[in-house]
Each structure stands twice: as C-alpha cells, then as structure tokens.
C-alpha cells in the first residue's frame, strides 16, 4: 500500500469514526433529554465542527478546481439541473421498486418522520451540513485520495460510490444512492472540486424534505414516463455540459 493510499485510508477512517460518533451522541442526548431539538442541534453542530476541522487542517481542498472563474455560475446552474433531474429519476425508480419488488421496505422509507426536518436545526443539519460533511468524507478525502494514489478513475469513482451507498443502509436507498455517488464522483474527477457535489447534495436533500410533505404517488404512469424522459434528457445535458466546458 503506497503512502498516499495509506494516508487516505487513515483520514477516511477517522472521518467515519467522527461521523458515526456524532450521530450516536446526538441520538443518545435526544433520547436522554426527550428532545428532538437537542438531537438535531447536536447533530448539526457536531457535523459542522467536523467540516471546520477538515477544511481548517487543509485535508480537503475547497476551491473550484478546474472550473474557470467565468464558468462558476453556469456550473452552479448545471449542478442544480443535474440534482433536480436525478432526484425525479431516482423517485421514479424507487416508486417502480415500491410497486413491483420492495413494497414494504419502500413504504417504511416513505413513512420517515418529517418532523425531524423541521426547525432551524433540522434544516441546517439535513439540507446544508450533512451534504457538506459527506462530500468532505467521500469525495474530498476518499475519492481524491484514490485518484492521487493512481487508482483508475472509474474504479475509484465506483468504489467510492459503493461505500457511499452502503452508508445509507436500505437496499432500496442503495440503488438510487449508488447512481447518485457515481454522478457526483464523476463530477469531482472532471472538475477537481467538491463544490458541484455539495450543491447537488444540498438540492437533493432539500427536495427529499419537500417530498416528505407532499404526495407524489404515481397515479398516471404515462405522465411519469414523460417526466422521466425529460429528466433523463436534462441529466444527460448537464453531464455533457461539464464534459464539454470543464
């Protein structure tokens, strides 16, 4: 194992330990105090502290990488387009799995308590801080380290995406999260920056919260096939844009 890969493994294992430690402490304090607010603030502040430490120690590069200054705002816009398009594609796939294969598990996912996302702490934790801290760990440390250790790009992207998906436990979630990880990993490899991934992750998590409060059940399959085609086309265009412009 070369020195760069060894360093990557150590940093990622440390990040993983801190990530789960904050989660356990947050849930424990929330249970002891019988307060969801305490749990949410503990998680938000804990993950924020991890992010500050990793950025402060320069373990992760927070720059636009190979994205030229004049292309920053177009890149932000394309990141949002990719996020929204993939979210609807993912929703369609999970809904099909719900109907044909994993109805009980998908129903349990859809019944997650939306109150966990409410309030300043809930929004900060779910929509902003979690995307940042996860992009630090998976793309900023793990994928970046694999690429620096001369691992083949597609192998590095796939390995990172698999680990990222396994972090999200449920089999139904793994399917959509694996694709999500591959897209964000490819964008990191293409741009040399975790910023597009952070933007996509923030939009994705924000839409997940919105979807928790509204009914998007598939009543007319024909309409959803049209939406799927539009979103796949938008997703392909976003990826093509990053390939062409960066």
Where are these regions (language model features)?
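N-terminal, membrane-interfacial amphipathic/helix-forming hydrophobic leader that caps
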Residues: 1-76, 80, 84, 206-246
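Alpha-helical transmembrane segments and their helix-entry boundary regions
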Residues: 8-12, 75, 156-157, 174, ...
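Hydrophobic residues within alpha-helical transmembrane segments
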Residues: 14-17, 129, 159-163, 199, ...
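Membrane-helix interface segments
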Residues: 36-37, 71-73, 119, 150-155, ...
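Juxtamembrane helix-loop-helix connectors linking adjacent transmembrane helices
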Residues: 63-130, 144, 148, 218
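Active-site His/Glu-centered metal-binding helix of metallohydrolases
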Residues: 132-137, 141-142, 170, 203, ...
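Membrane-interface helix/loop boundary segments of multi-pass membrane proteins
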Residues: 133-159, 186-193
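Functionally important transmembrane alpha-helices
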Residues: 173-225
């Amino acid at each position: 194992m070369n020195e760069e890969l060894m360093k990557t493994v150590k940093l990622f294992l440390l990040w993983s330990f801190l990530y789960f430690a904050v989660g356990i402490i947050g849930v424990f304090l929330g249970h002891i105090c019988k307060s969801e607010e305490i749990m949410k603030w503990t998680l938000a502040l804990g993950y924020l502290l991890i992010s500050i430490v990793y950025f402060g120690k320069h373990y992760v590069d927070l720059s636009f990488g190979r994205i030229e200054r004049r292309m920053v705002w177009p890149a932000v816009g394309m990141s949002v387009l990719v996020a929204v398009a993939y979210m609807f594609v993912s929703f369609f796939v999970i809904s099909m799995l719900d109907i044909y294969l994993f109805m009980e598990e998908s129903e349990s996912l859809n019944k997650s308590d939306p109150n966990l996302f409410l309030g300043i702490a809930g929004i900060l934790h779910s929509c902003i801080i979690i995307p940042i801290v996860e992009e630090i760990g998976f793309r900023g440390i793990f994928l970046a380290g694999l690429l620096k250790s001369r691992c083949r790009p597609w192998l590095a992207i796939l390995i990172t995406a698999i680990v990222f998906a396994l972090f999200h436990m449920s089999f139904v979630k793994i399917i959509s999260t694996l694709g999500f990880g591959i897209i964000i990993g490819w964008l990191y490899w293409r741009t040399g920056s975790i910023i597009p991934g952070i933007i996509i992750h923030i939009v994705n998590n924000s839409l997940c919260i919105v979807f928790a409060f509204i009914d998007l059940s598939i009543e007319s399959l024909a309409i959803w096939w049209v939406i799927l085609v539009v979103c796949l086309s938008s997703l392909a265009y976003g990826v093509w844009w990053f390939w062409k412009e960066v």
